[in-house]
């Protein structure tokens, strides 16, 4: 089988990774763009069923864009996304990759909420539809912060948890035995990782009781570190799908190595687990393909006593959702 030598010069300092990747002999499974359009229309209907209008929002513009892509006419990106002019949008492929990144995240969110509709969802959806068309250009942090919260909530919904979005805590997720109080933070730079983690733990200290609804309560922090790994917050590429996956995982492992002691030190404050995630579009060379990657890495805190080990084991159902995604639009 053909092999190709790849040195990851774009990664942060990291443990050694495999130098060789086998070139695939088959194409990746992909979805027709008409599926994305159908998904967007379904998401629009979901929003409207919760009293959220999509007129003159980015949702409406995504639909306009994919309507043109699907029928095969030359998409008028500049006129559709009038406020998204930037040097990063140089080609049709750039526009497509950025749009796919947005749409695939929205579809992931919808997938969870079709399974379980959390309390307090409507108010979050109002914030979700605001903000810039593309995350790489967004200066409205509220909209993207909420989108990240809903992305994480979707995992718990898909894993069968009862999810509550109506409290001051970003997410409260319940299974039969435990209550997980989850704070979600988007991190803008490497220098902010420890700070954002500390902020989240401080919030948990104010908001999390020892028990909630007769369940033992534990703290959980989710950090979106996409901009730490990729300061441009834009697009990335890989020689093969495995190569692109390893790039993200190595970046996540390096970031985790900077805070694992901090996570352990927060055991006294009830922090059970820290979830690091990268969400980015990727262009694959062999075979030619585009994909949205949601790459995850977890730091588990084994210093908590009592029921903590059982609580960690119960969270593996959520981890499995992120690792086994039967969906051609999203790759872990």
Model-derived regions, located:
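Conserved catalytic cores of phosphodiester-cleaving nucleases, focusing on short active-site segments
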Residues: 156, 171-173, 178-190
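Short, well-structured beta-strand/strand-turn elements
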Residues: 159-171
